[in-house]
Design a protein with these regions (language model features):
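Conserved N-terminal helix/loop that builds the PLP phosphate-binding region
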Residues: 54-57, 63-116
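A common structural junction motif
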Residues: 295, 383-391, 443-447
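Aromatic- and Gly/Pro-rich amphipathic surface segment
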Residues: 97, 113-131, 139
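Conserved PLP-enzyme active-site core in the AAT-like
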Residues: 2-16, 21-25, 99-102, 107-108, ...
Length: 447
């Protein structure tokens, strides 16, 4: 098969060192390159290969390969070199540089790799949004919670959390942490007396809570609980996924760490999975060391997709805030709705807290239909615009019945967490409010 070689970027800039780099590039027909690029969009593991092949084919600055001098250096055209940043490994310019990087400060080699994988730019943007000293991005929001808990809670430690919590996080706490001798106190989100009692009677390492919480959108006074925790030597970690960094900056209110599922608002397009932990550099560095040993690395294509999503984060969240508030107000007045949970409503028990620490109330509205399990299920089936899925925060509206989607247990088990048969969680997208309202009305009229 014929080959073609390309000169190095340095030679284009007038480098007369005489050492032209060369690379053997398989000469596929243009149609194959297009097909490979299309397939790569469906399979992110091939995206780097597709980009390099396509870039090499399209680059017209081909030169004859120089075999003289007895030296061969790996290289491609400038376009292909740029594309190769979206690969799964970091490449060293010189073999001799590797020992120096290894012997340097622990973060030196990792920094080079993060830059190539795209996560370095991502982490800097997130740190700026959260006003954090440092951020580490990982493969998922769940892994972010696991890495944080595994790093900051010592064996034999004690944690405090709330009844309203992402279910898989709770399952991990209940099943995995006891294997390390870690005990746990679970409190109601608004029960500050129970929090103080737990802090007074246990050697608490960490208080971990969401705010707003899932699915009832309860709000914890971050400044208050941070003072309570710090007075007893405990850390405070806030899962701020339901708020997004646009609406809430927990670190400025006293939290030590903030966790996000970047899958939700941050990426915002329901097409990528990722998570992040932000906070003081001292704490994030500990998580980063654990992360580099255990794995859970955010792949390069995911980094790109999240960076893309962050370009419109503020626009999307502002739109979702506005539409969700209008939807909550509308639902609260509808005769077929028994109750609405939304921190932007004066009827919400922590509305005053939300107003004091949030600039917007988020795009998720939870509510209870005036009906039973079956009528609620039918309502979900009748809506036409929202997708039926267990996620939130994206451009598309999503609706689900937690009793089916997340808590498919016995009714007695659901009652422990307050999950009623008629509960609905509605994640507002960027669709027009009137379109969403009319869709909800027609579905309610059928039950």
């Amino acid at each position: 098969m014929a080959t073609v070689s390309f000169s190095s970027p340095a030679s284009f800039a007038g480098d007369n060192s005489g050492a032209l780099t060369s690379a053997t590039i398989l000469r596929f027909p243009p149609n194959f390159v297009r097909q490979l690029s299309t397939k790569a969009r469906r399979n992110c593991s091939n995206i780097g290969v597709a980009q390099i092949v396509a870039a090499a084919w399209s680059d017209r600055r081909a030169v004859t390969s120089h075999s003289g001098g007895g030296s061969r250096v790996r290289g491609t055209s400038s376009h292909a070199a740029a594309a190769s940043a979206a690969t799964s490994a970091a490449a060293a310019a010189e073999v001799g540089a590797i020992p120096n990087a290894k012997l340097a400060q622990p973060s030196a080699a990792a920094l080079a790799e993060r830059a190539l994988l795209g996560s370095d730019a991502l982490e800097k943007k997130m740190s700026a949004l959260e006003k954090a000293e440092s951020t580490v991005f990982v493969a998922s929001g769940m892994y972010a919670s696991v890495a944080m808990l595994s790093t900051l809670v010592p064996a034999g430690g004690h944690i405090v959390t709330t009844t309203d919590l992402y279910r898989k996080t709770r399952i991990y706490m209940e099943t995995e942490l006891p294997k390390r001798g870690i005990t746990m106190t679970v409190i109601r989100p608004a029960d500050m007396d129970a929090l103080q009692d737990a802090l007074d009677n246990n050697n608490v390492s960490l208080f971990f809570t969401e705010t707003p919480t899932n699915p009832f959108l309860r709000c914890i006074d971050i400044e208050l609980v941070s003072n309570m925790c710090h007075n007893k030597g405990a850390l405070l970690c806030i899962d701020s996924t339901f708020a997004s960094p646009i609406n809430q900056k927990a670190l400025t209110l006293g939290a030590d760490m903030v966790v996000h599922s970047a899958t939700k608002y941050i990426a915002g397009h329901n097409d990528v999975i990722g998570g992040c932990i932000s906070g003081r550099d001292e704490l994030v560095s500990k998580v980063r060391i654990y992360h580099h040993v255990v794995g859970g690395v955010l792949n390069p294509n995911a980094s790109y997709l999240i960076l893309r999503g962050m370009k419109t984060l503020h626009l999307r969240v502002q739109c979702q805030n506005s539409t969700a508030l209008r939807m909550a107000q509308f639902l609260e007045e509808h005769p077929k709705i028994a109750r609405v949970y939304y921190p932007g409503l004066p009827s919400h028990p922590e509305h005053h807290i939300a107003k004091s620490q949030m600039t917007g109330f988020g795009g998720v509205v939870s509510f209870e239909v005036d009906g039973d399990f079956d009528s609620t299920r039918k309502f979900i089936d009748y809506v036409k615009i929202p997708y039926h899925a267990p996620s939130f925060g994206g451009c598309e509206s999503i609706i689900d019945q937690p009793a089916i989607m997340s808590y498919w247990d016995s009714k007695e088990q659901r009652d422990i967490y307050g999950i009623k048969d008629n509960l609905i969680r509605f994640s507002i997208g960027v669709e027009d409010f009137e379109d969403l309202k009319n869709d909800i009305v027609q579905a309610l009229n059928k039950i």
